[in-house]
Amino acid sequence: MREILHIQGGQCGNQIGAKFWEVICDEHGIDGTGRYAGDSDLQLERINVYYNEASGGRFVPRAVLMDLEPGTMDSVRSGPFGQIFRPDNFVFGQSGAGNNWAKGHYTEGAELIDSVLDVVRKEAENCDCLQGFQVCHSLGGGTGSGMGTLLISKIREEYPDRMMLTFSVFPSPKVSDTVVEPYNATLSVHQLVENADECMVLDNEALYDICFRTLKLATPSFGELNHLISATMSGVTCCLRFPGQLNSDLRKLAVNLIPFPRLHFFMVGFAPLTSRGSQMYRALTVPELTQQMWDAKNMMCAADPRHGRYLTASACFRGKMSTKEVDEQMLNVQNKNSSYFVEWIPNNVKSSVCDMPPRGLKMAGTFVGNSTSIQEMFRRVSEQFTAMFRRKAFLHWYTGEGMDEMEFTEAESNMNDLVAEYQQYQDATADEEYDEEEEEERDAE
């Protein structure tokens, strides 16, 4: 069975992760004690992807929880599904990272990382055929960003051929937690570009907008935002957990979505959007679902896909529906909006269909797109970074932990290169490349 090992780090990562497990347990019919109480064989058919079956028929999540302070983990442990995790898999320090990337990556985090890696190894040995890792973290704080990226690079060393998928919450433009977010995020992106295979980009502002505009919630709480994220996470992985007509795994997803190795930052969307309390009263049709999925207002990161072009995209539909209709709708989207897709990658939209819809819905869809417009987000963080770094503001917190200014400069230029690469492929056309080759051939003669 192709297992996925889930790792969550820092406050944000642990809160999203806890929500994710609530959703997954619900879909697979696992109750708060880890016992199966569902009603469909489909729920158990590929349950090994995320769960290890322990003695007495209990299902234990393949999850590692880490943080540099005990607070968030205590609340996970006392939450509705806190009892199903392996107690040894909670790894935490006492000092906290104080929103400082350097503490998470070099000092405090580095002291704790070996005990995290021990747990990761133990979980990996429990797998028949480990498919890859998924990491939940935010890039604005200290633990999720600093220690999260440290762990990713260590896992990369030890398991170089396994997929590394991250769900990364970027700092949002208007809603800021910490003044040093741009530093932490830039240093993290510097790591993610090199060491992760696929990054699902989320950000609080886009989630706020969705809650506000689409779900009509006056004051969205983090619980509501995390509910949206967990719906998306569950959708991205549903093809792996349930049988379906067109299945995919992490590697297939990567092969279809990543035309160039560095450009692996994806926008995600989910349809139909519902708030936690309300369920949809009428079933959506495949065309409606498709339309909502591709809607720019549905994207969970603050970048507008209409400002760029899609290099590739993938859609996972869930529920009983005709594959033919799905294919027709996806083709329809591409034909009507052909200017938003690069023409030098033909058939760049892949769809998969999975039989099990999420709880309480007849059908749903998850969208993952590799769009050049995501550069808007990197650009925004980069501008904030430069504004502070030019004056060396707050740098002493980082140099005090043994970091060098050089590292900041490198991270900054790596992020700017990334933006430039996205721009280059946004402007590229099929003919232009071809002309250049012809000219080169002529010169060679």
From Swiss-Prot:
GO terms for biological process: microtubule cytoskeleton organization; mitotic cell cycle. It is found in: Cytoplasm, Cytoskeleton. Belongs to the tubulin family. The keyword Magnesium applies. This is Tubulin beta-4 chain. Tubulin is the major constituent of microtubules, a cylinder consisting of laterally associated linear protofilaments composed of alpha- and beta-tubulin heterodimers. Microtubules grow by the addition of GTP-tubulin dimers to the microtubule end, where a stabilizing cap forms. Below the cap, tubulin dimers are in GDP-bound state, owing to GTPase activity of alpha-tubulin. The keyword Metal-binding applies. One of its GO terms (molecular function) is GTP binding. GTP binds at residues 11, 69, 138, 142-144, 204, 226. Keywords: Cytoplasm, Cytoskeleton, GTP-binding, Magnesium, Metal-binding, Microtubule, Nucleotide-binding. Its cofactor is Mg(2+). It comes from Triticum aestivum (Wheat). Dimer of alpha and beta chains. A typical microtubule is a hollow water-filled tube with an outer diameter of 25 nm and an inner diameter of 15 nM. Alpha-beta heterodimers associate head-to-tail to form protofilaments running lengthwise along the microtubule wall with the beta-tubulin subunit facing the microtubule plus end conferring a structural polarity. Microtubules usually have 13 protofilaments but different protofilament numbers can be found in some organisms and specialized cells. The gene is TUBB4. It holds the Pfam family Tubulin. Residues 421-445 are annotated as: Disordered. GO terms for cellular component: cytoplasm; microtubule. Gene3D superfamilies: Helix hairpin bin, Tubulin/FtsZ, C-terminal domain, Tubulin/FtsZ, GTPase domain. Residues 429-445 have a biased composition (Acidic residues). Mg(2+) binds at residue 69.
